[in-house]
Every structure is written in structure tokens, then in C-alpha cells.
């Protein structure tokens, strides 16, 4: 999400509605994409998010998938300072498919995404995470939200995730994968453009 908190999820509901409208008009051959959102605790605490998720649930926007970065921390500290909402129950009550995963377990996230892609309604995947994961002193704290980490914290993170590469360097094996995915995307785009013509 970008801009004022809560706006991103509301915008995404609009994008998902537009996709469904275009799909109804042009069919699956031309329009069949999903809308993905990454939203944090603060995003879901805003009032506009309730209106947006209610509408999405009511319209059964099965093409909408929200990944909720559930780290229970805002810039002011713990979310418990200002909010006691059970987001899973809130979304379920609004007609959504809901799942909870360990947000640091990529296999679990991938599995939840695959399930959400075939759901008959919008999906919330609550990814339980630790803000500042791997930082020796800042992990799980308010200062991890937006403060400077410093050399010691950065070194601790790099060690905890076994990242030996220099700063601002993309390792060759990752670059190869990115390029492979880019080429695959280009092939899909070219095939879509042929169908569009």
C-alpha cells in the first residue's frame, strides 16, 4: 500500500472490481488476472479498510488476495496500544477466505497463495512476521518500523539470514532467475497481445 494508510486496500478492491468488469466484457482469454495487496497492521486499522473489505466480500471478488504482514507493531509500538481487532475474524465475517501462515516460511506462503488463487471469494493470508527479522536488538520493536538500523544491526541481520554478499549486489544465481522469469513474462505478454489483436 502507498500513501495514506488504508488507501492501498481500497484501491485494490477497485482494481479487482475493474478486472471482473473487463472479464465479463472480454472473457477469460483476455482478462483473467489477480490483484495482490501487501498490507500492514496500520493499513487494516484504518476505517476505509472496513468499507473496502465489506464490498469485496459482498461482491465475492475471488481475484483479490491480501497478504497481511501481521507483525503486531506500528511506528508507535505494539498494535495493542490502540487496537484489539482479530483481523482473521473480521475478514471472515465480511465473507472472505482466510488463512494464517508463518510469514518467514516461504513454502507456507506459497501454499496459501496457491489455495487463494482457486478460492471462490477474496482471500486474506495473515503472514505472522517479526518486524526487523534477524536484527539483534531491534527485531519485534517499534523502532524497527522506521528508525535507522546502524552497522551493528545490519551485520546481525546479514549473519542471521546467511547473506554473505556485498551491499547492493545481486548475486548471479538470483539475477539468472529474475531474467528467466522476465523472459517467461514476455512470452505471456506476447501471447496475450496476439489474442488482443
Name each model feature, range by range:
Residues 1-183:
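Glycine-rich ThDP/TPP pyrophosphate-binding loop and its adjacent helix/strand module
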Residues 180-197:
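Hard-cation-handling environments
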Amino acid at each position: 500500500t502507498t500513501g495514506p494508510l488504508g488507501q492501498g486496500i481500497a484501491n485494490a478492491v477497485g482494481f479487482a472490481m475493474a478486472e471482473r468488469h473487463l472479464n465479463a466484457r472480454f472473457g477469460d482469454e483476455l482478462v483473467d488476472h489477480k490483484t495482490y495487496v501487501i498490507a500492514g497492521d496500520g493499513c487494516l486499522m484504518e476505517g476505509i479498510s472496513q468499507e473496502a473489505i465489506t464490498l469485496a466480500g459482498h461482491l465475492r471478488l475471488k481475484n483479490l488476495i491480501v497478504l497481511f504482514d501481521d507483525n503486531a507493531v506500528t511506528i508507535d509500538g505494539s498494535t495493542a496500544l490502540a487496537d484489539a481487532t482479530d483481523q482473521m475474524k473480521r475478514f471472515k465475517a465480511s465473507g472472505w477466505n482466510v488463512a494464517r501462515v508463518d510469514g518467514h516460511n516461504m513454502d507456507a506462503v506459497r501454499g496459501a497463495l496457491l489455495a487463494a488463487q482457486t478460492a471462490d471469494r477474496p482471500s486474506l493470508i495473515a503472514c505472522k512476521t517479526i518486524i526487523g527479522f534477524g536484527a539483534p536488538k531491534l527485531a519485534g520493536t517499534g523502532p524497527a518500523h522506521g528508525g535507522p538500523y546502524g552497522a551493528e544491526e545490519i551485520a546481525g541481520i546479514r549473519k542471521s539470514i546467511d547473506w554473505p554478499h556485498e551491499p547492493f549486489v545481486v548475486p548471479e544465481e538470483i539475477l539468472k532467475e529474475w531474467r528467466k522469469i522476465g523472459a517467461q513474462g514476455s512470452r505471456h505478454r506476447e501471447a496475450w497481445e496476439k489474442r488482443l489483436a
